[in-house]
Amino acid sequence: MQKVKEVNANRLREAVRLRKAVYKDGKPSFSSASYDSLSLAADPSLELSYLVAPPRMAYYEKVSRQIYGIYLKYIAPEDIVVYSIDEVFIDATSYLSHYNMTAHDLAMTIIREVLYTTGITATAGIGTNLYLAKLAMDITAKHAAPDKDGVRIAELDEESFRYLLWDYKPLTDFWMTGPGTVKRLEKHGIHTMGELAYFSTVNQDILYREFGVDAELLIDHAWGLEPCSIKEIKAYKPSTNSISEGLVLSCPYPYDKARIIIMEMADSLVLQLTDKGLVTDSLTLDVGYDRENCDSGKYRGPVHIDHYGRTVPKGAHGSTKLDNPTNLGSQLIKVAATLFDQIADKTLTV
C-alpha cells in the first residue's frame, strides 16, 4: 500500500506537469482510476488502483493438485519435483524423443492444456540444469514479451547464461543468492555473476574462507553449473525431519487473537505429525509484528527493515525443548501457547 501511494504521488505530479490533472476544490486530482497497465501507461491522469483478494489457501491447493494432474499426463512423477504451490521442476530429457518435440514445444503443450483446463497462464524456464531452468523462468522469461495468452518461455544454457546474465543486476534476483550473501560478496567488490566467476579464478581461497563449503555452490552458479539433478533430489533422505507451519495474516491481529492463531497452527502441526507417524521433542516459534506499530509513533523498541522496505518492530523468536518426544495435540498446543506468551509483546499487533 505504501508503494502504491508513492507511485500515485509521482503520477499526480506528472499529470500536473503535463496539464492532464483535473482540479477539485482547487486541488489537482486524478480523472479516474485503473489497474490496467496499458491504460495507466497511456494516461498519466489515471490513479493506480488495485484489488485486494483475501487468501484462499484451500482453493489454491485444490487448483495446484489439478494442475499437477495435468503434468502427470505427460511426465512421470519420478521426474517432477514440486518446489512450491505454483512451481515445479521437470526433467524432460527422456521425453523429448518420445514426443518428438523440442523442450520449448513440450513446455508450451503442457502450458496450453493448463490454460484451457483452468484458465491459468504460466511462465516456463528451460535450462540445461536445474539452476539455469530456474533463472530462465525467474529472470529471462519475466523480461520477455508474453504471447496473446500471457505465456512466457525462455531458455538458457551455460553459454547464453554467461552472455546474458553475467552483467545482470541485482544479484539478489539470482536463485539462492540472498541479501546476506550479496553483502558479503560486495565486501570483495563483487556485484555481478561475471565478477564472481572471474574472482573464483584468481581468489578462490578467499571465497572459501568467507563462505566455507557454500563457496563451491556459489562458484558453480557463477559459471552456470549445477551438479544436483532431480534424480538425486528424489533419492535424498534427510537424517532428521522437521515440519513447519507458516501463516500471513490478512490484517493486524491483537495479542489475544494472535494467540488463538498460534494454537490453531500448532493443531495443524499435530495433524501433520500424526499423518507422518512422527513425534517431536522441540518447538520453535517466530512472530512478526505489523508495521502499524511503528506508524502510530508510539513504539520505541528495536526495529528492522522487512522484505518490502518497511520499518517494523523486531520480531520475536523462541524455542522450547520437551521432556519427552510426543505428537499429543493437547500437550503441543499448550506448549505453543506458553511459548507465545513468553516471547510475544502483548502491546503489539501481529
Residue ranges and their predicted role:
Residues 1-220, 226-230:
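Gly/Gly-Pro- and Ser/Thr-rich, intrinsically disordered tail segments characteristic of DNA damage-repair
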Residues 46-47, 173, 183-349:
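DNA-contacting surface of Y-family translesion DNA polymerases
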